[in-house]
Amino acid sequence: MAKINELLRESTTTNSNSIGRPNLVALTRATTKLIYSDIVATQRTNQPVAAFYGIKYLNPDNEFTFKTGATYAGEAGYVDREQITELTEESKLTLNKGDLFKYNNIVYKVLEDTPFADIEESDLELALQIAIVLLKVRLFSDAASTSKFESSDSEIADARFQINKWQTAVKSRKLKTGITVELAQDLEANGFDAPNFLEDLLATEMADEINKDILQSLITVSKRYKVTGITDTGFIDLSYASAPEAGRSLYRMVCEMVSHIQKESTYTATFCVASARAAAILAASGWLKHKPEDDKYLSQNAYGFLANGLPLYCDTNSPLDYVIVGVVENIGEKEIVGSIFYAPYTEGLDLDDPEHVGAFKVVVDPESLQPSIGLLVRYALSANPYTVAKDEKEARVIDGGDMDKMAGRSDLSVLLGVKLPKIIIDE
């Protein structure tokens, strides 16, 4: 009760916050513990505009190195490619053993004469895949002979990178209680711990607000996972399936989404979020486990571990049934990877407590003159705008917190809608 009383007393006896500051700090610790930090990249900020940086690793063709199978530092270098034939419907008929050709900047070597003569597939990309499987051609990623780079006029491929910066304005959320000093004293008289009661009330409700913002923003920015003939619209229809079939189908799609993220970003997925019913289907599938020995590794917010190692989080407030697979990776002290960035504003305070995210304030009702406790939290929530823009010039004017422009643009999280039979509830 002492902290609450001191905070209320400070509001009516002084114009300075310095006296009440230790109490403000102590009361704000609970909020961050309840935030879903496992599904969002967290970067604290003490500025009203949060700044984020992103590094792009590029090859000589200005492509992301992880999005192509092309190699440039070996026998088929960047300059050498200028003399290599591009694969087309016409050129594929003229290829012979030992020839090199390129397709989507990847170099291939022919292992036999007219390698495409017996392949009836009309789609050029699929025909190339068949030729690789049949050992008619191979991927040409060979390292160069030692003498290639010993001459003075040898061409060496550039290892390129680009550092981008984007900013998102810090925004606010504010809650207050109607609990007065008298009510707090009544709570104490009836056996309640009033300070803990107020802390839990405000911190829990504020964390619930922020978590909804995080989860709903994650739903917005995630790419939709569409597979021809299975999830053409971004939905998987499980409204007809038996429980084992539904669980097996949904778990299979989760595993495919993990592979998709790894292919598109090189990062391995670290979490899975599902609506309540979708999480129940995964649990019924038999591929969700929660053993007592897992507790030291599993977040207290998680439902359990899927068989592929991903912790499963349950979104109980979602208006739709869905499953999301995503990445949050802390790489060293400064580098964080994630689909959504959460930047709590620390008000410029140099605090020893790393969990401080906001401040409790005193609000006086002008009608009753009764002081009430309020919690003000400021933070920025952002996705990477460089996944949206057509070019760098356009990216500079995009706000990472503008979820209208960020919709469906993140390569670090993938969403699949789940169609389930409607629940009938008798009124």
Swiss-Prot record:
Subunit field text: Homopentamer. Interacts with the portal protein. Interacts with the major capsid protein that forms hexamers.
UniProt family annotation: Belongs to the Tevenvirinae capsid vertex family.
HAMAP family with a match to the protein in the record: CAPSID_P_T4
Annotated site location: Cleavage: E10, S11
PTM annotation, UniProt: Proteolytic cleavage at the N-terminus by the prohead core protein protease gives rise to the mature capsid vertex protein.
Organism: Escherichia phage AR1 (Bacteriophage AR1)
Any Gene Ontology CC annotation: viral capsid
Its job: Capsid protein that self-associates to form pentons, building the capsid in association with hexamers of the major capsid protein and one dodecamer of the portal protein. The capsid vertex protein self-associates to form 11 pentons, building the T=13 laevo capsid in association with 160 hexamers of the major capsid protein.
Keywords on record: Capsid protein, Late protein, Virion
Descriptive protein name: Capsid vertex protein
Protein origin, superkingdom: Viruses
Name of the gene: 24
